[in-house]
C-alpha cells in the first residue's frame, strides 16, 4: 500500500539544507545551531523530493557527528511511526522543497580533516566535532600526525599555532585559542 504512495525516505537534515551524503557532518562543520530529520518522497535527483514533515533538534557545543547521529536516529524512529498512518490515509501533505535554498552535503574526504590553524577557533572545533569519529580531524606536528578527538574554546591569546600552556592550548586565526582535550 505504501508503494502506491511512492517511496519514503528519512533524511538526516532539515531539507532543503544539506542534501547529500554527509548532512550531519556538514551541519556541525558549518556551525549550525539546529539540525533534524525530514520525511520525504524519493525522487530521481538526490534528496529533492517533497517533504511532509521536518523535526528539529539543537546542536549543543559538546555534540559531535556520533551524538547527533544517535539523537537523529531516535527522533526518526519515533516520528516515522507518527507519519506512516497519515501517509497511507492521505491525511498528510507533501510540499515541494524550495530548490533555491538547497545546500549540498558532499561526501567527506579524509584530506578535509587537516587542521589549518589560521582558521577561527570555532571553525576548527566544528571540524573536530563534525569529523568525529571518522575520518577525524588531525594536525601535523614535527612530522607526526595527531588525530584530534575533542577540543573546546579556551581563553588564551597568542600567535597562530603557538602552544600556550601546560596542557595543549593552541592559538587560532581569530586570536582565540582551543584547548585540545583528547588526541
Model regions and ranges:
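Acyl-group handling in specialized metabolite and lipid biosynthesis
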Residues: 106-119
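Donor/substrate-binding cores of folate-linked one-carbon enzymes
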Residues: 1-104
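Short secondary-structure boundary/capping segments
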Residues: 29, 43, 105-107, 138, ...
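A generic structural signal for well-ordered coil/turn residues at beta-strand boundaries
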Residues: 33-36, 47-48, 53, 109-111, ...
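An anion-binding loop in the catalytic cleft
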Residues: 118-183
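Basic side chains
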Residues: 19, 107-110, 127, 145
Amino acid at each position: 500500500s505504501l508503494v502506491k504512495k511512492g517511496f519514503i525516505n528519512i533524511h538526516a537534515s532539515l531539507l532543503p539544507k544539506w542534501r547529500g551524503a554527509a548532512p550531519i557532518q556538514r551541519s556541525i562543520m558549518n556551525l549550525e545551531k539546529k539540525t533534524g530529520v525530514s520525511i520525504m518522497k524519493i525522487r530521481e535527483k538526490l534528496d529533492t523530493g517533497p517533504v511532509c514533515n521536518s523535526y528539529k533538534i539543537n546542536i549543543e557545543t559538546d555534540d559531535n557527528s556520533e551524538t547527533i547521529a544517535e539523537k537523529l536516529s531516535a527522533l526518526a524512529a519515533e516520528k516515522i511511526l507518527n507519519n506512516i498512518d497519515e501517509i497511507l490515509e492521505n491525511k498528510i501533505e507533501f510540499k515541494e522543497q524550495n530548490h533555491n535554498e538547497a545546500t549540498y552535503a558532499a561526501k567527506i574526504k579524509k584530506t578535509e580533516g587537516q587542521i589549518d590553524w589560521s582558521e577561527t577557533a570555532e571553525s576548527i572545533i566544528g571540524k573536530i566535532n563534525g569529523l568525529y569519529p571518522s575520518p577525524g580531524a588531525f594536525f601535523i606536528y614535527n612530522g607526526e600526525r595527531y588525530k584530534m578527538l575533542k577540543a573546546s574554546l579556551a581563553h588564551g591569546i597568542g600567535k597562530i599555532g603557538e602552544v600556550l600552556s601546560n596542557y595543549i592550548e593552541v592559538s587560532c586565526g581569530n586570536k582565540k585559542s582551543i584547548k585540545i582535550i583528547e588526541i
